[in-house]
Every structure is written in C-alpha cells, then in structure tokens.
Amino acid sequence: AIRCGNGSIGLSARANLHIRGVTEQTLPDLHARLEEAGLIDADPEVERLRNIVMSPIDDLDPEAAFDLGPGVAALETRLEEDRRLRRLPPKFSIVVDAQGRLPLGDIDGDIRFEASRDGTFAAFVAGEDALAAECGSSEIGDTAARLALAFLRLAGDEAGPRRMWALVERKGAEALFAEAACDTKPRSRSRRRASLRDVLGAHAYGADLVVGAAASFGGIEAARFKALIERARFLGADSLRLTPWRAFLISGLDPRDAESMVDSAANLGFIVDPDEPCLRVAACPGAPACAHGARRVRDDARRWSRMLPKGDGVLLHVSGCAKGCARPAPTAATFTATAAGYDLILEGRAGDSPAWRDLSSTEVAEFLASEGATIFTPKRPK
C-alpha cells in the first residue's frame, strides 16, 4: 500500500483488504508482490471467484461446531478447477459459518453454509431462510458448485437475475434446489451475530489469547498498520485475521502480551473500545478518495456518530453515492450524499427512494437530535 498505492488500506464488510490509490503504472509491481506473498492467484478469473467469508476464529473457538479449514480448502479448490463457475456474476459470495462465539448470522451470502456439531453443513440460498440442503464437510465444494451452476442455468443470459435472492424471488428456492439435485428439509437460518464486545480487546479462547481491534469506518493508514504488525510480531503473535466487522484479530499471545497489544493498538489509533460511537455508523471513503463520492462523508459521519445511542450494531449508513458500497444491507437510517446535500432513506439502502431530499449537514444533525430516539429504538414485534 505504501509503495504501490496512496498509503491507505480499507477493511471491507466481506473481510477483504483493499489497497487504495493503485495506478496503471504501479499495478504490475503490486501484482508481483502479492503473488510472491501468496495472497492472490495468478489467474484473475480464479481470484474473482474467491469471494468467501468464513468464521475467523473457528480453529481456536471451543464453542465452534468444528474447524472449517479443510472444508473451505476443498471449496476453494472446486471454485478454481471448475471453469463453468467463471460465469458467475461479480460479488456472488459464499458464507461459511462455524457458529461459536463469533457467529456470522448478520453476514449475507448468495450461498450460506452453517456448521453443526455432528460434522454436517446446512446449505441455504439467499432469499430462503426456512429450507436447506445438507452435506458433509468434505462435500461443501461439490454442494456449492451444484447450487451455483443451478443458479447460472435458471438465471439464463445477462438479462436474468444477477444475485441469488433475485432468482429465488422469481423462481422459488424449491426450483433451485431441485435443479441442483439437492435434497432439502425444513431448517431455520441462524441470525445469531457476533457482538463487538466479543471481538474488540483481549479475549480467551481456551488456552489462547486473541486481541481484536477495529479501524474507524474500515480505513487504515498503511504506516500505522505496518507498525501494529511489527509490534504483534515482537510480542510473539502467530496470526492476524481479517473479520467481516471491519476489525482484525491477533492470536498467539500470552496474557501479559495481550494487554500490551491492546494498549499498542489503541496508541496507534485503532479501536479497542466497543462503545466507540463511530462503530455504530457505516461510511464509505466518499470524496475526494472515491470518484463517485459527492461529499466528504466520513467527516459528517464521525460528527453524527456522537449523537447515536450506545449499543451494538450499525444504526446509521452515510454513503457518498447511491451505490452504497459501505453497507449493502438495509439500515435504520441511510443518508446518501448528493450534489445538493443528503437524501434520507428510512429502513432501506443507499439507492432506495428517499423520504427527504437534499438535507444540509446541519439539517441532518437537527433531524438526528429530534427524531433519533424514535428511529433508532428497536421495534417490538406486534
């Protein structure tokens, strides 16, 4: 990021790391460095398919169903070897959830695998939460391929649905499972999600100590990240793992060094306190970092975050444009930047129809002060 980009790194909601500011001139050098480190595939088509989000600590968590490593390795191999899958649309994703202390119930994927203690997976498709196929750990790659190929056949040409939920909405999940030759049974999709209180700071996983730290809105200065990694190595850490909560986990520390790692992360500007206000807000880089951004949204997002109630989970989405890259999921309140101000969308996404248009930053703050208590109070089921 320092040598080939602009020194800025982004942590995404898909547990990916983005190197920003790469140019046509620096891209070849970046590719060479990433290949040397074993971080990308030489074939761009294969790399594009590796959109897999898995539980970040399954091998250390005694509450997890089992270690996902062998199954996910088989899944990656199938994605790499089956050339038919290269027709899948961009952003087609697979989630593999080991349950445990850091479950992925709030992370959506086109195909979702949930592990059980008996060594099997329940395979769900987006748009259907009450029906699933079942497969063993060694069958996860084959099951994912069958469901993905069924999606391609039923979706048809470029005019067809580009995401699984849209296909299920049109054709029904039963038709998709039948096309994939997958037997199904009633099963409820898990909505258990990890609390940031179980992610940030120092936590024991059996005999292992793990330190979690987050980046404000997922943005990291590469120099600070490098300093953090060097400190973790000095303290004897054995891994740094990305998570889908725009945070990372450092493992392999003893109790004294874990506390030192927490202090070092905080001193370097990373978030270790789960009550930090900006954790309640999703915000993209906005202008000028992104060409699509209409405003400097993170400045506003940081200011507005102090007006939100304490708690766990994202309440507010501030987007630089209607694409809504920082948060694809609906949010209690979304402010989408425009040339004239901000559009407000309630219980929706950045590109949805707004309830109010072209609000100034001051008007947004006034709205949050007067209506926030109502909007951000959890709705009780009737």
Question: Which residues are covered by each model-predicted region?
Answer:
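Mobile "lid/hinge" segments at catalytic clefts and subdomain interfaces of large enzymes
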Residues: 92-170, 329, 334-382
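Gly/Thr-rich phosphate-binding loop signature of adenosyl cofactor/nucleotide-binding cores
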Residues: 181-230, 234, 271
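Flexible, glycine/charged-enriched surface loops at secondary-structure junctions
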Residues: 8-11, 85-89, 152-175, 182-196, ...
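Generic structural signal of hydrophobic/aromatic residues within well-ordered alpha-helices
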Residues: 30, 75, 164, 173-180, ...
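Small-residue-enriched alpha-helical segments and adjacent helix-cap loops
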Residues: 1-124, 129, 134-138, 142, ...
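Generic surface-pattern signal
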Residues: 57, 80, 152, 169, ...
